[in-house]
Design a protein with these regions (language model features):
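A short, aliphatic-rich beta-strand micro-motif
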Residues: 100-109
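Allosteric cytosolic regulatory segments
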Residues: 136-143
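Short alpha-helical interdomain "coupling" segment at the junction between an upstream regulatory sensor module
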Residues: 130, 144-163
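Amphipathic alpha-helical regulatory segments at dimerization interfaces
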Residues: 1-6, 11-23, 71, 75, ...
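Flexible loop/coil segments at beta-strand boundaries within sensory signal-transduction domains
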Residues: 37-38, 108-113, 122, 126
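Signal-transducing coupling segments at domain and membrane junctions
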Residues: 50-58, 77, 82-101, 121, ...
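GAF sensory/regulatory domain recognition
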Residues: 17-21, 29-64, 84-86, 160-187
């Protein structure tokens, strides 16, 4: 409920990573959003110390080419590494050295992958059917919340533009009216 009520992405995404990590006890939770060119999944929020370092340097992964997150961003299907040491797709991130298992879930809006929810644990084999199902439902809710926040921002921008145009039009009309008005009275 908290997630769907927040309207600003800059507040929403860090809130999500904190809540997910606290609720499930994950070592790291990150949210990546696919950029406009669909070339990179860009880290937008993270709760761990390593994640904060990655955020500071603008961490991004190439869609389809780098790690589990890149895989999920390209194919739009969940990916789980129960033991990252045995997963051929896993990207060994030096900022998250304690990761032993990882799950990445697509964030989708109308069948388009807009991002990835990435959760990591310090224990191997931690992911099971129950938390996969729960996190999949949560990923769907996160996707809706992200889309709502984006639509809210677009609506706010459109409203500001309309107000600016209205003020400009009103001012132009008033100036035109003032010039065209002839003086009435005694000479």
């Amino acid at each position: 409920k908290i997630i769907t009520s927040e309207q600003k992405l800059t507040t929403l995404l860090p809130l999500i990573t904190r809540l997910v990590s606290e609720s499930f006890g994950f070592y790291h939770t990150g949210i990546f959003l696919v950029n406009e060119t669909k070339q990179f999944a860009v880290l937008q929020a993270a709760n761990s110390e390593g994640g904060k370092i990655m955020l500071a340097r603008g961490h991004k992964l190439e869609v389809g080419a780098t790690g589990i997150v890149g895989y999920v961003a390209k194919f739009g299907t969940p990916r789980i590494a129960l033991d990252v040491g045995l997963d051929a797709v896993y990207f060994n991130n030096p900022d998250l050295p304690n990761t032993r298992s990882e799950m990445a879930l697509p964030l989708k809006v109308r069948d388009e992958t807009i991002g990835v929810l990435d959760v990591q644990s310090e224990r191997p084999g931690v992911f099971n059917d129950n938390n996969v199902k729960t996190l999949s439902i949560l990923a769907d809710q996160i996707s809706i919340a992200i889309e709502n926040a984006r639509l809210f921002t677009q609506t706010q921008q459109a409203l500001m533009e309309a107000q600016t145009l209205y003020r400009q039009n009103l001012q132009d009309s008033w100036l035109t009216f003032s010039r065209d008005e002839t003086s009435i009275g005694y000479q």
